Amino acid sequence: MDLLSGTHIFAVLLACIVFQSGAQEKNYTIREEMPENVLIGDLLKDLNLSLIPDRSLTTPMQFKLVYKTGDVPLIRIEEGTGEIFTTGARIDREKLCAGIVVDAHCFYEVEVAVLPDEIFRLVKIRFLIEDINDNAPLFPATVINISIPENSAINSRYALPATIDPDTGINGVQNYHLIKGQSIFGLDVIETPEGEKMPQLIVQKELDREEKDTYVMKIKVEDGGFPQRSSTAILQVSVADTNDNRPVFKENEIEVSIPENAPVGSSVTQLHATDADIGENAKIHFYFSNLISNMAKKLFHLNSTTGLITIKEPLDREESPNHKLLVLASDGGLTPARAMVLVNVTDINDNIPSIDIRYIINPINGTVVLSENAPLNTKIALITVTDKDADHNGWVSCFTDHEVPFRLRPVFSNQFLLETAAYLDYESTREYAIKLLAADAGKPPLNQSSMLLIKVKDENDNAPVFTQPFLSLSVPENNSPGTQLTKISAMDADSGRNAEINYLLGFDAPSEFNLDHRTGILTAVKKLDREKQEKYSFTVLAKDNGMPPLMTNATVLVTVLDQNDNSPVFTHNEYNFYVPENLPRHGTVGLITVTDPDYGENSAVILSILDANDDFTIDPQTGVIQPNISFDREKQESYTFYVKAEDGGRISRSSTAKVTINVVDVNDNKPVFVVPSSNYSFELVPPSTNPGTVVFTVVAIDNDTGMNAELRYSMVGGNTKGLFIIDQTSGNITLKEKCVFADLGLHRLVVKAKDLGQPDSLFNVVNVNLFVNESVTNATLIYELVRKNIETPVTQNIETTDASSPSSDYVKIVVAIVAGTITVILVIFITAVVRCQQSPHLKAAQKNKQNSEWVTPNPENRQMIMMKKKKKKKKKHAPKNLLLNFVTIEEAKADGADNNRSSITLDLPIELEEQTMGKYNWGTTPTTFKPDSADLARHYKSASPQPTFQIQPETPLNSKHHIIQELPLDNTFVGCDSISKCSSSSSDPYSVSECSYPVTTFKTPVSVHTRPPMKEAIRFHTPMKETTTVEIWTHPQPQRKSEGKRAGKSQRRVTFHLPEGSQESSSDGGLGDHDTGSLPSTSHALPLGYPQEEYFDHAAPNNRTEGDGNSDPESGK
């Protein structure tokens, strides 16, 4: 429970505690003569009504002043706030509380009703009226005569008549003064036990009547109010003869009781007083003191001679229940005797009860108008019954004389609330004359009655009723606008305007219909279309004219009858389906959906393919399209045809839609590296390169499309020192740290390119060789290091720090010069020997070979191959002697564009040809393969299903070959079998083609040296001769391999005679191990130290053949 709800509950509980009684009293104090609109109090705060939250009440809180019709209230109350203000009526305490005992409190009482019913309370408010000094004290007469005996002793005191001041307290009489008084007299003021201030005249000198018998002076009286008020009178003192005894009452205090119905003249009491004097001085005179009220003087008579008090006017206990009569007895002497007579007026049941009706609901012409839907306990009037009698005679009860839906609920002892006790119904009783009876408990009891008229106001409490709450209609479509459908009628039990009915369409009614609000006629104002909407269900309303109006609703169901006026409709004008290229025949291509808005036979649709398209079939009912062909995106990317839909109407209708089937690519192509073009290239990285510099960029392509061709690069091996990092998106290889001396040398990075194909991605890897050095002083040595790098585990780099130093460079130059000189001499010698042995026929064939297709032997060569096979049977056990191998160097003649290049032809023995050409169909089998990945199989176990390349027993083992690293299952390497492959495509723009052969080793390495900044491309030809020709093109080698740029124009041809049975295997850049079933081989670089991959043409991934990355189909033969 939240805090706000808890506060509300607390307020309600507190209100219940505070208002646990139905009535309350509240006292306020006001001063008389207050001006208009003075704030007296705030009932909302003073009664703690502000604790009740407004939202807990059905209606806002109201405060209503309950007063009698014709009364002029002295206060008013703001109904909404409960603030009490004075009105323009004069608040006069002396008038409101006339006749009360002096100094008694004066109260003014009103009642306030607090509404609504949930918190109804009747609050009795008593206003204590404080006196203000608005009256001046007055002497009983303007001339006061007093007689003083001449023998009065000095300081003798004589009472003077007291003044009358209606004000009380400090505003009453406070002091008396003599104005221009004689020195013979003084004035003193004494206070009686009743609090009355009595002036006394003091004799200050001896009097002598004979000398002066009359003294005249002024006496002034003042009150204590602010502003102070006063009055004066003439005091005339007569000096009289001596009287030295005053009268004495027999009883100083007398209390008598007399019924209020005592007749006028009845005796109340007899006073007795005596005087010791004789003669005239013994004659006693009785009179009322000026202190008694005017009402007492009016009601009672005192015989001045006898002292008998009688009733002067009829008594009324209800007006004044007791009277105090102060009687003075004087013999003409100085001080009169005093006696107090208390007259108690006893009650008799002489007053009938009175009924005072104070309306809470203001009447109109004396009649209360009450709505028939007034809630229970609606407060109508406050009934106050009073009886001026006392005790049982004043006990009054109030009730009604017969059964009515009203009751009187007591709130105070003599006040009742008239409220509704049941719900009213104008239709059953329209007017009530309530007779209120009030009876007292006297004997005999007296009663009073009063009539209260209540008129019940008719309310619109009966809603119209439809004769048919549900109405079902039918109308054919394509009707004429304005067609009358039916007439709707309703009845209302009310009368007058409450029974007048208007017909309305509900908010859910469509615009196709109209309803006359007077007659209730329903019409179709628009042409209806069943295909657009078959059924219309809406509501109609019947509303009377009452306030507030009441309404009821009925449901109308309009059914539109069908006509065949619509053709079949395809959900799309053109359908585009996407199917994978590996979707099998008769699989599901897609679903054609067609609808016919008509009904029944008119909506039965048959589907068919137009133009007798046999590639696809469609189910005439379901619209399922199935292929009769296999898809190949590379052959045809899309198919288009038209489908016809025809309905079964009497006059059939049809429509067509275009269908396009798009063949979606499947991730069936692995990434292919373009840069670097092979595993044998390298990039120079100066040691002064700043960290963050891009030193190389790897580029790979993928024949697939979309996400299948989206590539991500990563390093999966090498980079043992962590010098380099690669950007997975761009392939940029960046230097991570500053190079130090220990970092000089060749660094190998194994870079993986992985596509984002789904569900399975494909990948490939390549070697990136980064040579950290100031310059490339010996390219041959670097390529040799690259070659060794291939045979070295990826966890180890081939460092060349010593070779990069100036001293080692000089040593390498000298060694290279010596080796080159020896090689040239050896080549010249071998060439001369070979040429001497060659016949003219072989030379002619050798020249014709240069212009023939190098991959397809002619018939003459095939015959020579057969002859060589026969001869080699005899030479099968010939010893392997280096001296029997010759190299012949020929100068090629300028011929067109070929005069810019040098070639070297290597003639291999027939045994090598038998081991190569005899096992591969060069004329029919494509030999293209990818120069994209290093031969890493000797360092990893492949998870690929391809044949693996394994180290053979003939290969010299090294500890580095014993490190077998595990790759995750998603690393798939493309294997290359032991049979050599030729490629007509390469990333090197200078090479024409390449072949790799299974060999063991060249026992006499031969290398051709050009300038160090040269790169050489080797082209091998295998004509059907006793020797195998290898054509080597040499080109200038820049420090950084630059693709697409030609260099070098010299050309030489060299022929090598390989030892019998020799085999050479050079990696084609594909990953994987050799098939264990293939010929045993080892992996060595060519004698020239140049990797074959350096001489491929530009990579052409789109020219891949079925032989890429797979074992030769003839290798197992």
From Swiss-Prot:
Region (Disordered), start-end ranges: 1029-1117
InterPro entries xref list: Cadherin-like_dom, Cadherin-like_sf, Cadherin_CS, Cadherin_N, Protocadherin, Protocadherin/Cadherin-CA
Record protein name field: Protocadherin-11 X-linked
All ranges on the Cytoplasmic side of the membrane: 834-1117
Main location: membrane
Keyword entries, A-Z: Calcium, Cell adhesion, Cell membrane, Glycoprotein, Membrane, Repeat, Signal, Transmembrane, Transmembrane helix
Organism: Sus scrofa
Domain Cadherin: 27-139, 140-249, 250-355, 362-466, 467-570, 571-673, 677-795
Gene field: PCDH11X
